[in-house]
C-alpha cells in the first residue's frame, strides 16, 4: 500500500477520536471557547442527551467574518502564536483542533458577530475536503455553535453512546465543574426544551455560597472551611469540608489549576494525606480548590483532553497543599464534638423521662461523627424537652376525631406554639437541671463563655476592701445602634458582633424569626406567588371558604392565591417561596381558622395582615440547636438585606450590648 496524504475530513475524524469522546466532550470544548472569548452569559440547549442537538450561545467578543473560515480549519487558533505563548498559556483552549474535529463528525454551524461588525455570518463545512461556506445571518453580538446529529457519519462511534439519561448525567457533571470555576459567568442549561440548570453570576459572598450549594449541596456549605494561602507565588484558595462533611464516594472533589479543571494524582495525594487522621477508610473528602501559580511553572499540554498537568516543582506544590489543608483541619477541630446518643431516637414517655437519671454526654476531639445518620442523631440529641409540654404524650383514643375537632385542637395549639416559640427565641435563662435532656456544653465552651460574660464579684471585693454602698453604681448598657462584623458564635445560639458603637450579642433563633418574617412581609406590592404545578384542592367548612373569598386580596398580599370551587371546597393556586416546602394541606386551613379567630376577637381588619404575617413566621421558622459562624453570617446578611438595614435593635430578645469595662478593669495591673 502506497503512502498517501489523508483527506482533510478523514484526518479530522481521526483527531476527533481524541477530542470528541461523547457529547459532554463537545460541550466542554465549546463552553471553554465561550469563556476564552470573555462571555458573561452562556446558554446551552441539548436534545436527546446531546446526540441530536447541542447548541452553545454566548455574548463574548465574537469572530469576524474574515476569520470564520479559519475557525473551522485544523490547527487554527487566536490563543498562541509562538512556543513562548504555549509555555505561558492561560486560556483554556490553545490547540485549534476542537471545531475542526467536531465538524468532521457532525453537522456543525458556526454563527458569530463581533461588536465592530453590523451583520452576523454563519459558517459550515461540507464535502470531502471540508470547504467552508459562508452565508449572512441574524445574531446579536457573540457566537452560537450548533452541532446536529453527532457521529452521524461514524456509526461505530455512535453505537457506543450510552442512554440519553447517562449522557446527560456526564454533561451535567461537566457543567457543575465549569460553574464552580467561573462564578462571574451565568450558565443556563435546557434539555429537551426544559430548563434544568440556572447558575446565576455571583457578585458577593452570599451569592457565591448559593452557587456552591446549588452544585455541592447544603451539607457541603454547612461543613465547609474557607482556605486561602499564598507562598512564593503559589496561591491556594477555595473550600474544604470538616470531617463532618465527609462523603461515602468521591463525587464532590473539584480542583482547578489556573482556572483549568483537573484530576491530578499529585494533588489528590496531598489532599488525601492531609485528611489521613480525620477520615475513616471508607470516607472521602469533599472540596473545591483553586491553585494559581506562574504559568511557566506548570505544563498543561501533557494530556489529549487536558485533564492532567505537570508541575515543574511538584514536591513544593504537594507539600504546600498538604500543609495548608492540614493546618485548616487542625484549627477546625478546636471545638469538641459530642458523641452520639442513639437513645434519643427512642423517645420516652414523660413519666419515664422524669424517672431517668440525667446524663452528661462525654466529649472527645477524636470522636467526630461524620455520617449523615449520625449527624441526624446529634441534632435530635441536642433538642431539649420542656417541662409541662404535652406535644409528645401518646394517649389512647376511643374513636377517631373529626376533621373540625382536629383543626380546632391544632389552632388552639398554634396559639400556644406561638408563645412557646417566642419563649424559645428569647434568651435562655439559667435553669440548670430544668433543661432536662439538653446535653451540657463542653468544659472549654463553658470556660470561654464565662470568661467572656462574667463580671467581678462585688461581694468578695467588698469583703476584702470595704467601700460605701453609694460607690457601687448600676452599670447601664449602651444602646445598640449597629451590628457590624460577626466575630464568633457563643453558646451555639448567639453571635458576638463588633461595630464602631461597641460589642453586642445577637440571638440567632430570634434572627431566624425576623428573617422569616421579612421574607413574608410585602415590601413593594404583594409577595410574588409561585404557582403550584398541581393546584391543591381541599374541603373546608362554609365559613372558612367565605372568609377566604372575603379577604382574598389580603391573602394575595401574602402571595397566597386562593380560589373557591364551591361553598365547601377551596383551591390553593400558588404560595410564596417561604411556604413552598410546608404542609399546605394543614397550613392553609390553620391560617384561615386563625384569621377567623382573629376576626371574632373584634380586631380591626386593617391589623389582620400583620397578625397573619407574625403567625406564619412562627409556623415556618425552624430553630436549630446550634449554629456555625458561616450560618450566623448568612442569617445576619439576609436579615439586613430583607429589612434594608432597619433592624429591630430595640428588641431586647434580639440584641443586647455587652459591656467589657468591668472585665477590663479587673485585668488591669
From Swiss-Prot:
Q: Which residues form the signal peptide?
A: none
Q: Which CDD domains match?
A: HATPase_MutL-MLH-PMS-like, MutL_Trans_MutL
SMART domains of this UniProt entry? DNA_mis_repair, MutL_C
Which gene is transcribed and translated to give this protein? mutL
GO cellular component annotations of the record: mismatch repair complex
Q: What HAMAP family does this protein map onto? A: DNA_mis_repair
Compositionally biased intervals (Polar residues): 357-372
Q: What is the lineage of its organism?
A: Bacteria, Pseudomonadati, Pseudomonadota, Gammaproteobacteria, Vibrionales
The membrane-spanning stretches of this chain are: none
Record's keyword annotation contains DNA repair = yes
Pfam families found in the cross-reference section: DNA_mis_repair, HATPase_c_3, MutL_C
Question: One GO molecular-function annotation for this sequence?
Answer: mismatched DNA binding
Alphabetically sorted, this entry's keywords are: DNA damage, DNA repair
Give the residue ranges for region: Disordered.
Answer: 343-408
Protein role: This protein is involved in the repair of mismatches in DNA. It is required for dam-dependent methyl-directed DNA mismatch repair. May act as a 'molecular matchmaker', a protein that promotes the formation of a stable complex between two or more DNA-binding proteins in an ATP-dependent manner without itself being part of a final effector complex.
Could you tell me where the Basic and acidic residues compositional bias lies?
A: 344-356, 390-408
Q: What is this protein called?
A: DNA mismatch repair protein MutL
What family does this chain come from, according to its entry? Belongs to the DNA mismatch repair MutL/HexB family.
GO BP annotations, alphabetical order: mismatch repair
